[in-house]
Amino acid sequence: MTKAVLTSISQLALKALLYEVSLSPKPGLVDRFDNGAHDDMSFITFIDSMIALSPFFQAYIETGFAYAKEEPLLLFNRLRQLGQKAEETMFCATQGINTHKGLNFSMALLLGATGAYLARTPHLMTDLGRFSKEDTLAICRLVKPMTAHLIQTDLGHLNTKKEFTYGEQLFVTYGIKGPRGEASEGFTTLTDHALPYFRQMISQNDPETSQLRLLVYLMSIVEDGNLIHRGGIEAWKGVKADMRLLLQQDLSTTDLRLALSSYNQCLINQHLSPGGAADLLALTFYFAFLEKLL
């Protein structure tokens, strides 16, 4: 019974990734229609990546459930070790293409936290109904003590390094903390912004329109390391401003799709891809499934 419940929830994480890549059109991003601003990956690359990651999603939630009483740092270390194996498997499946590295990191923590939360709230195991927004908040808050050390440990000693990863370079150049920052703050972009916005949208619109509007909203607020890496601070600010204007227009679903298709070409021409917003879109979908908003 327990394993079946944990399996069903881990499948919601996979479903969230499938919904994210399938949502179309997404400016600058891989979707059903085209590869956005990416010349090294496609919709199929993402499918290959998700299949590779899926068994690890189950391992994350089972680890959180099994070690719920463990010190947060010890649980983090278990999840990170699993996450590194998942990353290696992903790169093998995609021939070295980074499709979900940051998202895998975040999912490892959130699925681990979900497992730990379920171990502490057994009624959710016996009656898998709708998770409340309070449940969502509690799960995200469990990540904070697991990752309180992360910025200092991972990014605090970069002055001694000569070669940087993509994420380290963003921190050194711009102070962008990326997924580590989101995690160490308890995913406040999710709990304070993305999910409240999506709950409102889904109460007023059909699911696809709500998802597209959520993407635009995220592009208007997220500190997007992918955009900054590709185009610099000014390009990122420009995208945010454009998306704020698009939100203000309150377009019909048809006109919104047309506007996003047009903006997709703009971002392709500039080689810009809002990958940070895409990751948070998928994480929002995961909790939307738990709360039965979708």
UniProtKB/Swiss-Prot annotation:
Its EC number is 2.4.2.52. One of its GO terms (molecular function) is triphosphoribosyl-dephospho-CoA synthase activity. It comes from the Bacteria. Keywords: ATP-binding, Nucleotide-binding, Transferase. It catalyses: 3'-dephospho-CoA + ATP = 2'-(5''-triphospho-alpha-D-ribosyl)-3'-dephospho-CoA + adenine. HAMAP family: CitG. This is Probable 2-(5''-triphosphoribosyl)-3'-dephosphocoenzyme-A synthase.
